[in-house]
């Protein structure tokens, strides 16, 4: 039985248990003649020993050894038996320094001495924690005291063994057979042990194991200081269970604060039988409390071959952040020449950090980029900056160009209290050629402009007020200057009372649109004059600036039942303009016999009746029970026509037609155009829902029936504008009595397979206006398999031409006919192929194609990918450059140390393959 002794600060408390104690409260421990005593545990927890007159116990002798780095019993060729005879010693244990980075099979053929559990013996929960390519895992066994948080000097020592002797004169206890010493969270095991009570020290020999809070150290011989927990294990191997890390050392020392010091130590995340990579150092320190390790005179070895040396390295032993160099990246382009980026990460505090990106470019010099991130109880944000003294002179003489290239920015979100929210998104660059010439690691979103916005929001119980100031700085010379909103004030809400169930809402907006037109000349990349900037092509009202106020009060009466609803709505739309127009704009209007009115307003009523029904039934399909719903919907919309051609367009466009367009109150976005409407939208949705709530399929279809032609159009798309350009206005289909048929659907074959599709067919022209079908496969239990097949078509493009500042229609270049295929597929558990092919049938060209392979194991990953791509604007579906780029990308990741090269590969894989991020998150 177990008896807990008293806690001593300088003299270790001792507890001895074993098979001899099974049948009696306290066992009698016997030794040979003149030195033999009968020792019992006293009531005070100490030892009560008296001479034993007739002792002839068959106990093993006390191990005789010296405190060498390797066990004497292991190193010698013979030892003395209890009867004085000489017996052959066991074969000499192999040294860890001879293992070449692998674990010692001589200790256990299946590496069970390192708590290694093969994959076939893991539980389902344990399998979920490792990748499909891992052959097993390090599983820490449950043991008493493993979660004990008491300090070592305040914890009693528990001891158990199969047999024991005690020399009272020397106060040495000798233990043999499955010896276990436990103090606090630390536990030491061995075949034999000596416990020196006077020195509070223990020595263990044979199959030594030291365990402490998720760490295991295995060796041949150990010394343990029992008053503070310090220990040394010789010929040591170690495991950090949660980090799936292991290593070895000539000897390992555990300090009082649980830091492990390794002499000639190694560190790796590879499986016990693998030496794919190891980090080896003269002196290695592992600190579980901080989650980091250090090594001096360190070499990175691949297959036991040294490939990299550093006098000092600081590396993670778990998932916590640390300061240090991040994986470098290198490339070569015609603009910059050879480029090398060596980022350095500063882990300044748990809630803020910084990253420095020194970028050497052979053609341009050294560029410095920096990023600072912070998080407080009420705010979060990023501050970034970059500077380059450009030594490339090919843009000398270009407007707005300077050799001092720079960027700075701030993104911040601050909750001032529970109602006030402040946001800043501000970036400024030195010149409009910045992103054409230079790459950046600062995560700036668009390469055609940078955002400069500040917003203050107040959220009341029944309203939301917002003050916004937003400007844009162009990062190109081929687009017109966008309008700034300086300022924009919105106030939206509803009244807190509902007489008779009525709901009263209101929306208000005041905004000042302004911009400074730039009509300077600009150059081609070869330095030749290309012409004036696009702002010079703006004509008439496109050159206007001014104030716009919009008021939108409304009332509705929702009538809802379990089987359906009817909601009539009445709104009043009032917009007032106070405009300015330069002399060039007025001259353009005069040439068209049009006049300019600086003060204009527009008032329109809006009537809407939205209604829907809900039906469901229980049905069975292919043996599977479903609940099928039928949800018809009808919406009538009336807005009278009012000529709006004399109003400028500041922030308005017309989105593509889809099923959602059936239920919009205005076919335009923004407030500069209110579409006239006298129409009835009819649609129906049906869903198939399984008993567990899983939606197997849904399909929607609908159409708009027009009782009047749509006369309000955007500039450039009016009947007068199209005739002036010799284009057929009937192509816009504004006088038909019905819209295209709109379809949208989704079908899930199971939780792994799904297909999404939308389709718009115009019966007036007997052609497909737009459509897409996207097939996605990614098993829920194995997200490492990904297949995407998609096709999209669009021929109804009404696009804003950013190079002319007007809308256009009927341009063949705007037609989209593209397929997109991407795949990640494992060939064998550790090898996968990755590929994407995006092709444009309209211009018979490949937009992007890449293919390669990936090798992934428990300790390292390699990707090699060949890529071809054009610079594509995904929002406008237009290629920005006809010149193709090509590259071969290599990515190497040593798990536990991070990427060595090629981390930018992640960017185009994440963007190009739907499901890639879920795959990586699951693998982690």
Swiss-Prot record:
Main location per the UniProt record: membrane
Pfam families noted in UniProt: LptD, LptD_N
InterPro entries: LipoPS_assembly_LptD, LptD, LptD_C, OstA-like_N
UniProt KW keywords: Cell outer membrane, Membrane, Signal
GO biological process: Gram-negative-bacterium-type cell outer membrane assembly; lipopolysaccharide transport
Signal sequence segment: 1-33
Keyword Signal: yes
A cellular-component GO term for this protein: transporter complex
Highest rank taxon of the organism: Bacteria
Location(s) in or outside the cell: Cell outer membrane
Segments of skewed composition (Low complexity): 66-90
Region (Disordered): 58-102
Subunit structure: Component of the lipopolysaccharide transport and assembly complex. Interacts with LptE and LptA.
Family: Belongs to the LptD family.
Reported function: Together with LptE, is involved in the assembly of lipopolysaccharide (LPS) at the surface of the outer membrane.
Name the record gives this protein: LPS-assembly protein LptD
Encoding gene per record: lptD
């Amino acid at each position: 039985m177990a008896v807990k002794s008293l806690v001593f600060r300088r003299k270790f408390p001792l507890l001895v248990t074993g098979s001899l104690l099974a049948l009696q409260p306290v066992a009698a421990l016997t030794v040979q003649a003149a030195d033999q005593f009968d020792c019992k545990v006293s009531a005070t927890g100490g030892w009560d020993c008296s001479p034993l007159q007739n002792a002839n116990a068959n106990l093993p002798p006390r191990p005789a050894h010296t405190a060498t780095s390797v066990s004497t019993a292991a190193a010698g060729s013979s030892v003395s038996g209890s009867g004085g005879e000489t017996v052959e010693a066991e074969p000499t244990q192999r040294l860890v320094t001879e293992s070449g980075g692998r674990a010692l099979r001589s200790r256990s053929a299946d590496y069970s001495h390192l708590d290694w559990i093969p994959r076939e013996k893991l539980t389902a929960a344990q399998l979920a924690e490792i990748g499909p390519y891992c052959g097993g895992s390090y599983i820490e066994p449950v043991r008493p005291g493993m979660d004990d948080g008491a300090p070592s000097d305040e914890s009693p020592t528990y001891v158990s063994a199969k047999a024991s002797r005690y020399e009272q004169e020397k106060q040495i206890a000798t233990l043999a057979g499955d010896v276990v010493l436990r103090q606090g969270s630390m536990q030491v095991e061995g075949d034999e042990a000596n416990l020196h009570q006077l020195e509070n020290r223990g020595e263990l020999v044979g199959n030594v194991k030291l365990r402490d809070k998720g760490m295991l150290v295995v060796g041949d011989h150990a010394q343990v200081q029992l008053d503070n927990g310090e220990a040394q294990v010789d010929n040591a191997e170690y495991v950090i269970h949660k980090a799936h890390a292991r290593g070895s050392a000539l000897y390992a020392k555990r300090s009082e604060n649980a830091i492990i010091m390794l002499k000639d130590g190694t560190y790796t995340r590879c499986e016990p039988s693998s030496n794919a990579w190891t980090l080896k150092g003269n002196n290695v320190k592992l600190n579980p409390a901080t989650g980091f390790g250090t090594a001096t005179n360190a070499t990175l070895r691949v297959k036991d071959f040294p490939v990299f040396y550093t006098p000092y390295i600081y590396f993670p032993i778990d998932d916590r952040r640390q300061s240090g160099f991040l994986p470098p990246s290198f490339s070569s382009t015609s603009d910059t020449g050879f480029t090398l980026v060596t980022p350095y990460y500063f882990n300044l505090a748990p809630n803020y950090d910084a990253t420095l990106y020194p970028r050497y470019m052979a053609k341009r010099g050294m560029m410095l980029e920096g990023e600072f991130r912070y998080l407080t109880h009420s705010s979060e944000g990023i501050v970034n900056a970059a500077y380059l003294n450009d030594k490339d002179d090919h843009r000398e003489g270009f407007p707005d160009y300077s050799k001092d290239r720079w960027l700075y920015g701030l993104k911040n979100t601050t909750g001032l209290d529970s109602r006030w929210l402040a946001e800043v998104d501000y970036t400024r660059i030195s010149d409009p050629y910045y992103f054409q010439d230079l790459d950046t690691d600062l995560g700036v979103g668009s390469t055609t402009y940078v955002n400069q916005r500040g917003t203050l929001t107040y959220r009341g119980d029944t309203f939301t007020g917002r003050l916004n100031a937003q400007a844009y700085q162009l990062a190109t010379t081929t687009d017109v200057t966008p309008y700034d909103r300086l300022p924009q004030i919105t106030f939206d809400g509803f009244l807190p009372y509902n007489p008779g169930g009525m709901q009263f809402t209101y929306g208000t907006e005041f905004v000042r649109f302004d911009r400074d037109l730039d009509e300077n000349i600009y150059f081609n990349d070869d330095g030749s004059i290309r012409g004036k900037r696009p702002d010079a092509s703006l004509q008439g009202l496109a050159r206007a600036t001014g104030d716009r106020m919009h008021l939108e009060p409304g009332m509705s009466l929702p009538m809802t039942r379990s089987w359906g609803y009817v909601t009539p709505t009445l709104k009043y739309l009032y917009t007032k303009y106070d405009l300015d127009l330069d002399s060039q704009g007025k001259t353009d209007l005069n040439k068209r016999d049009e006049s300019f009115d600086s003060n204009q307003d527009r008032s329109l009523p809006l009537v809407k009746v939205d209604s829907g029904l809900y039906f469901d039934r229980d049905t069975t399909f292919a043996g599977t029970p479903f609940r099928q719903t039928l949800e018809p919907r009808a919406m009538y919309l009336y807005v009278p026509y009012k000529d709006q051609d004399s109003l400028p367009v500041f922030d308005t466009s017309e989105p593509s037609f889809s099923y959602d367009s059936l239920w919009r109150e205005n076919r335009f976005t923004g407030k500069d155009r209110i579409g006239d409407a006298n129409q009835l939208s009819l649609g129906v949705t049906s869903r198939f829902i399984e008993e567990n709530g899983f939606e197997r399929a849904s399909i929607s279809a609908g159409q708009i029936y027009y009782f009047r032609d749509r006369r309000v159009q955007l500039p450039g798309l009016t009947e007068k504008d199209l005739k002036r350009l010799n284009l057929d206005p009937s192509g816009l289909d504004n006088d038909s009595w019905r819209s295209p048929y709109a379809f949208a659907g989704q079908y899930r074959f199971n939780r792994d397979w799904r297909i999404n599709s939308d389709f718009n067919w115009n019966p007036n022209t007997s052609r497909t206006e737009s459509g897409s079908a996207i097939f996605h496969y990614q098993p829920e239990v194995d997200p490492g398999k990904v297949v995407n097949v998609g096709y999209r078509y669009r021929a109804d493009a009404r696009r804003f031409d950013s190079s002319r500042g007007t809308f256009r229609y009927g341009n063949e270049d705007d037609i989209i006919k593209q397929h997109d295929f991407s795949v990640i597929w494992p060939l064998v558990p550790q090898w996968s192929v990755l590929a994407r092919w995006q092709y444009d049938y309209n211009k018979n060209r490949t937009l992007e194609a890449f293919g390669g392979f990936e090798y992934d194991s428990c300790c390292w990953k390699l990707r090699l990918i060949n890529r071809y791509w054009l610079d594509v604007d995904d929002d406008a579906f237009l290629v920005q450059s006809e010149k193709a780029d090509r590259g071969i990308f290599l990515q190497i990741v040593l798990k536990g140390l991070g990427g060595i090269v090629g981390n930018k590969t992640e960017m185009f894989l994440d963007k190009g393959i739907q499901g890639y991020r879920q795959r990586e998150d699951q693998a982690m």
